[in-house]
Amino acid sequence: MTKRVTIIDVKDYVGQEVTIGAWVANKSGKGKIAFLQLRDGTAFFQGVAFKPNFVEKFGEEVGLEKFDVIKRLSQETSVYVTGIVKEDERSKFGYELDITDIEVIGESQDYPITPKEHGTDFLMDNRHLWLRSRKQVAVLQIRNAIIYVTYEFFDKNGFMKFDSPILSGNAAEDSTELFETDYFGTPAYLSQSGQLYLEAGAMALGRVFDFGPVFRAEKSKTRRHLTEFWMMDAEYSYLTHDESLDLQEAYVKALLQGVLDRAPQALETLERDTELLKRYIAEPFKRITYDQAIDLLQEHENDEDADYEHLEHGDDFGSPHETWISNHFGVPTFVMNYPAAIKAFYMKPVPGNPERVLCADLLAPEGYGEIIGGSMREEDYDALVAKMDELGMDRTEYEFYLDLRKYGTVPHGGFGIGIERMVTFAAGTKHIREAIPFPRMLHRIKP
């Protein structure tokens, strides 16, 4: 009996006969030869079947029957295919299979996603099948690499995984963006972020991170928004703002390197410019303040490439502003110290400048915009209470959060990264919907 292997491992079996469980992604050929494009989730590669070889091995009657089975295979039929692995310099993969036998496992009739072009709505309605296509597999392989490296990076840097709840009993920030549900007669909300709970974890464990789904009821229909997405939040006690930025930069560079190392064929499939990714790793990220960014935007707003509206100091950036800023520097760019009025209540003011807060957004170049948001947290109880009172917030909704400042408060901060935005950036794809297996967007909750 031949050894069963995966496609990605065939390089270790050159000259040997192996069996692969796969699906037929495509088929071509005529006369005495048939070409099968095979996939098994690890990679795609080609199998070649020659009619005379089957006749010689099995005799004319059985050999012709088996070859006829191969000729009649339809798209996405599942098979056990046996053959001898050969090197193939013409192939991007570098190897092909000289097919010696085949067994059909599950037939596929009238597969809806054919090689022709299909509209986005059709593909999204058939997302459960679209996932099988070469480019969608590549994006998910990049997502997997990013998740793997996330756990590896934080473990190496002394962080403990901490699981924040998905259901919360209070409306932590903007209640207009919360999904509300009934919790045994009491209103409950799907989490927008695990950050507030993560701060409690940091006071117990020092360095913590969580990774899980979050939900935002934003009625935004853009290429950068999902209503359900995955977030990695990290929180760190006894931390300075510069140390936080250094950690964020090291993390993003580790993610990009991890994708280069773990998913090179996926990047090739997507035709991602890997030299750009290598440059982002090699060069220091740019760091500028919010006010410097506004000055820069105003200075260049009449330039030919300045496709953005005029902003004054105190205004928030839109996507065109973020795109221009990061493209101007050509590397991921931290914009620091935003106005307190447009940021969250818990952010610590810049020393000597209470109108600005110690925070930063990391803007990715090539039009991908914000991928990380982070800040130092206000650790002083009285200052935090004063800020909440100024904003008319109900303190009783935040009793546990305020307790963290009453019992051994310390300087601390953290940041969060939207995994789908990072996947989109690393993969070089245009729309965030392809960065998650089953995207949830405005007007889309199926399949």
Curated annotation (Swiss-Prot):
Taxonomy, superkingdom: Bacteria
Catalytic activity: tRNA(Asn) + L-asparagine + ATP = L-asparaginyl-tRNA(Asn) + AMP + diphosphate + H(+)
Listed SUPFAM superfamilies: Class II aaRS and biotin synthetases (SSF55681), Nucleic acid-binding proteins (SSF50249)
Molecular-function annotations in GO: asparagine-tRNA ligase activity; ATP binding; catalytic activity, acting on a protein; nucleic acid binding; transferase activity
Keywords: Aminoacyl-tRNA synthetase, ATP-binding, Cytoplasm, Ligase, Nucleotide-binding, Protein biosynthesis
Membrane-traversing stretches: none
Broad class of the protein's primary localization: cytoplasm
EC numbers on record: 6.1.1.22
Annotated compartments: Cytoplasm
InterPro entries assigned: Aa-tRNA-synt_II (IPR004364), aa-tRNA-synth_II (IPR006195), aa-tRNA-synth_II/BPL/LPL (IPR045864), Asn-tRNA-ligase (IPR004522), Asp/Asn-tRNA-synth_IIb (IPR002312), NA-bd_OB-fold (IPR012340), NA-bd_OB_tRNA (IPR004365)
UniProt feature coiled coil, ranges: none
Biological process according to GO: asparaginyl-tRNA aminoacylation
Recorded GO CC terms: cytoplasm
EC class of the enzyme, as a word: ligase
Assembly description: Homodimer.
PANTHER family: ASPARAGINE--TRNA LIGASE, MITOCHONDRIAL-RELATED, ASPARTYL/LYSYL-TRNA SYNTHETASE
Family statement: Belongs to the class-II aminoacyl-tRNA synthetase family.
NCBIfam families: asnS, PRK03932.1
Protein name: Asparagine--tRNA ligase
Organism the protein comes from: Streptococcus pneumoniae serotype 2 (strain D39 / NCTC 7466)
